[in-house]
Amino acid sequence: MKKVLILGVNGFIGHHLSKRILETTDWHVYGMDMMSDRISELLDNESYKSRMHFFEGDITINKEWVEYHVKKCDVILPLVAIATPSTYVKQPLRVFELDFEANLPIVRSAAKYGKHLVFPSTSEVYGMCHDEEFDPENSELICGPINKPRWIYSNAKQLMDRVIWGYGMEGLNFTLFRPFNWIGAGLDSIHTPKEGSSRVVTQFFGHIVRGENISLVDGGAQKRAFTYIDDGIDALIRIIANKDGVASGKIYNIGNPTNNYSIRDLAGMMLTLAAEYPEYADGAKQVKIVETTSGAYYGAGYQDVQNRVPKITNTCEELGWAPTTNMADSLRNIFDAYRSQVAEAKALMD
């Protein structure tokens, strides 16, 4: 029976991972976050009470709680991070302070107490790599100039990867995983009308629900390999289980190369699908696709990546894993999940 510490347990990955752990294993979850709305059903479920332990707190404040639970648990997942591009551009220091500085003591505690650290790197570390597939072992990590603060997230995560690798050279048991555009219900709030305040699928979905125009940044030609959250969690469960130590000292891309679509394609797919739902059809009819520049949308410090496809050979072979959810099913699952929230999202327009 493993004890799994999830910092950021109420976040997108955290709440989906907790649910899967409680449903399919006998492991205990010890979670901290500043809110508990996404995990309220887990906390209220009588059958999980003995295995779901939650503390409302902040990793930058409740440092003694964090260290105590790093010592107590077997596997440590520090999932607290800012991961929205508009924030990279507008508040780069805030991104660095949380994503790197606040997480560094947790990494050090995992090394000190001999725990398995499962750390979320990011597909962003590859930056503007020119490879057709990004290889965790061989691809170069290429970022833009200093006057483009959008790279602060990529650089903060890359630096942490290198620090963790350094601790690994001194005995830390670690696994780095790089999510490639994981999507699903609960990614961001659809109740956020401000452009750039959430990630692309949720942003577009909120616009469709409210009948607002969808803005394509620089024409929407940028492509992304989208990965359904359930597929990502499948891989994470295997990493945490770490059968025969297979995941120790490894870096895994977790993504779905077959779901590689442009942002313009994504907008079209979502509008077409919305027309099939009575709850969304009226809003979708009012949506126009308009073009904008990255400077107008994100700010002058933005720079984009045109293609981002993961090489997942080692992930599949070593973990016995493969992504199985295509793009159409991924989007339909998201549309189904949000049906009950349509009225709330529309109310933002009133």
Where are these regions (language model features)?
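NAD(P)H-binding glycine-rich loop region in Rossmannoid oxidoreductase-like domains
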Residues: 59-98
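Active-site "gating" loop of Rossmann-like NAD(P)-dependent oxidoreductase/epimerase domains
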Residues: 81-94, 101, 112-115, 120-153, ...
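SDR active-site strand-loop-helix element
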Residues: 7, 32, 76-79, 117-123, ...
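A conserved pocket-lining segment of Rossmann-fold NAD(P)-dependent short-chain dehydrogenase/reductase
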Residues: 88, 143-148, 174, 180-193, ...
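Conserved cofactor-binding/catalytic machinery of classical short-chain dehydrogenase/reductase
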Residues: 61, 102-105, 116, 124, ...
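N-terminal Rossmann/SDR dinucleotide-binding element
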Residues: 1-75
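Active-site Tyr-X1-5-Lys
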Residues: 147-175, 205-210
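C-terminal substrate-binding subdomain of Rossmann-fold SDR/epimerase-dehydratase oxidoreductases
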Residues: 208-350
